[in-house]
Amino acid sequence: ITWIFDAVNYYGAGNALSGFITVLLIAYVSIYFGIFLVAIKFFKDHKYRVLIIPSVFFLLEWFKSWVISGFPWLNLGILSESLWGLLPIVGISGTSFLIILIIALLLEKNRVIISRITASLILAVLLIGPGHYQDGGDEKLKITVIQPLTTNMERIINMTNEAESDLVIWPEAVTKFDKTVSKLVPKKVVIGGFFRQENTNVYTSAINLKTGHHYDKRNLVPFGEFQPFGSLLKSINNFFNIPNSSLSRGSFYQTKADWSALICWELVFNETFTRRVRGTKYIV
């Protein structure tokens, strides 16, 4: 999470305050693991501890993924690719549950043989399950990615028109969306990150310039893109002078198309990822 330190420091907080805020964030994430350790001690002698303890871990990980706006770092289910055998079926938190269940079964002092056998079977499924054999298809696309540091619109448009690609991807939040932009890149499939206004709401959106279809970013960055506690922490925003810190969250249900997009750190949100990939041909 060093990017938190860099971002806050960039907006003028200084090394000391940026470090303090980063430490607070680390402490916040650590609370969930602390609660889990307390739960282990509390339920260690319970008759159904083998199921209760993994369930507590599952609930804590799920809660951490959505409180405020969610901070799904250090999710156990995605730490090792070799254990993704059931990931498409049970998801990240479900995989985390199964990993903790395996550990609980291996540490079980009663019914040792059945516990070891059950743990071995679950581990085998995680190691060789269907998640390791997903077919990505044979279709190939030629893609051009415009570097995020490129912010000059004239240069971006020239690079886009010169590209001989099936798809051109622009940086996130490169500019405010204007329909005239789409006329500058005719007959090209371009997916770009724009600030899109609808009534009084402003979204950061991925927009297909050829079709006009868009996806609005749902998982916003706390303090950077929205105020998690509204006017209560408005003074913090004024102190840091953070731009675009009052964006609106995209709808949970968004219109499907043959392509879908995940913007910035939406990639680490299991529920958002799962919903976006269903029924789509491409994910950007």
Located regions from the model:
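Membrane-embedded alpha-helical bundles of multi-pass enzymes
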Residues: 1-132, 284
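Soluble catalytic domains of enzymes that build or remodel membrane lipids, polysaccharides, and related
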Residues: 131-284
